[in-house]
């Protein structure tokens, strides 16, 4: 859990903004959303495999666009 020490004479809003930023970097909200409901191991594997396929297609598209620009 991210912690933020409030500095002397620091406005609350600034400290809150720093805390929100540190939570975002730590991935707290995404982890909470992921754990909100139970996900079967097979569903998790399917989701991860689909994400991997999507990343691979995106990488291939970027690579092909890069090759097109070279010529």
Curated annotation (Swiss-Prot):
It comes from the Bacteria. Keywords: Ribonucleoprotein, Ribosomal protein. The keyword Ribosomal protein applies. One of its GO terms (cellular component) is ribonucleoprotein complex. One of its GO terms (molecular function) is structural constituent of ribosome. InterPro entries: Ribosomal_bS21 (IPR001911), Ribosomal_bS21_CS (IPR018278), Ribosomal_bS21_sf (IPR038380). Gene3D superfamilies: Ribosomal protein S8 (1.20.5.1150). GO terms for biological process: translation. Pfam families: Ribosomal_S21. The keyword Cell wall biogenesis/degradation does not apply. Signal peptide: none annotated. NCBIfam families: S21p (TIGR00030). Belongs to the bacterial ribosomal protein bS21 family. This is Small ribosomal subunit protein bS21. It comes from Acidithiobacillus ferrooxidans (strain ATCC 23270 / DSM 14882 / CIP 104768 / NCIMB 8455). The gene is rpsU.
């Amino acid at each position: 859990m991210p912690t933020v020490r409030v500095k002397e004479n620091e406005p609350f809003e600034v400290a809150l903004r720093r805390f929100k930023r540190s939570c975002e970097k730590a991935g707290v909200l995404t982890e909470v959303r992921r754990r909100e409901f139970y996900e079967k191991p097979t569903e998790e594997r399917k989701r991860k495999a689909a994400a991997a396929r999507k990343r691979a297609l995106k990488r291939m598209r970027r690579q092909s666009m890069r090759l097109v620009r070279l010529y």
